Amino acid sequence: MKSSLKPVEKYAYSIFEIAKEEKKLDLYKHNLETINSIIEEVPAFFEAVGDPARDRNERKQIVIKNLEGEIDIYLISLIDLLIDVKSVKLLKKIVLKALDFVNEALSVKKVLITTAYELTKNQIDRLLQSLKKKYVCEKIEPIVVVDKSIIGGLSINFESQVLDNSLKTKLFNIVKKVN
């Protein structure tokens, strides 16, 4: 790995390398997703951990008390290190970049599905099965976004290919033809 990498990439790649060496890619994927969920759903937790007004050891104890046994010790050590170097604010970016490395190693592909309404689990599963057949890949993870501005239908973005079957686009194309 190049020495010109940014700190986020260095930390993320180090986590990925540990996961690979330990043969724990699936576990780290799950752990990284757990950390990301905590960051998004309980922002106060990492605000407390990153608060420089709090004692450093107290912040480390918060991490250990709440995450030990839930995530791998190397990831807890990463958070401890970020506390030491006053860079907890980088954790989300590190986690997302490490997830990119892990997903690539596990051959996991991401698909962005934009709909005007909430999809059921069954609808998502059927859509993923179709995509797996069409693109011949085993592991696809959906990112479902509800965007009422597309009016109806859906838009699928998979590996830089866009299938836009939204009502908004259809109407736009009709207007374009008329003008």
From Swiss-Prot:
Keyword field contains Transport: yes
Annotated compartments: Cell membrane
Keyword terms: ATP synthesis, Cell membrane, CF(1), Hydrogen ion transport, Ion transport, Membrane, Transport
Highest taxon above the source species: Bacteria
Family annotation (InterPro entries): ATP_synth_OSCP/delta_N_sf (IPR026015), ATPase_OSCP/dsu (IPR000711)
Gene Ontology molecular functions: proton-transporting ATP synthase activity, rotational mechanism
GO cellular component, one term: proton-transporting ATP synthase complex
Pfam families recorded: OSCP
Membrane-topology descriptor: Peripheral membrane protein
Family according to the record: Belongs to the ATPase delta chain family.
Function: F(1)F(0) ATP synthase produces ATP from ADP in the presence of a proton or sodium gradient. F-type ATPases consist of two structural domains, F(1) containing the extramembraneous catalytic core and F(0) containing the membrane proton channel, linked together by a central stalk and a peripheral stalk. During catalysis, ATP synthesis in the catalytic domain of F(1) is coupled via a rotary mechanism of the central stalk subunits to proton translocation. This protein is part of the stalk that links CF(0) to CF(1). It either transmits conformational changes from CF(0) to CF(1) or is implicated in proton conduction.
Subunit structure of this chain's protein: F-type ATPases have 2 components, F(1) - the catalytic core - and F(0) - the membrane proton channel. F(1) has five subunits: alpha(3), beta(3), gamma(1), delta(1), epsilon(1). F(0) has three main subunits: a(1), b(2) and c(10-14). The alpha and beta chains form an alternating ring which encloses part of the gamma chain. F(1) is attached to F(0) by a central stalk formed by the gamma and epsilon chains, while a peripheral stalk is formed by the delta and b chains.
PANTHER family found in the cross-reference section: ATP SYNTHASE DELTA CHAIN (PTHR11910)
Name this polypeptide is given: ATP synthase subunit delta
Lineage: Bacteria, Bacillati, Mycoplasmatota, Mycoplasmoidales, Mycoplasmoidaceae
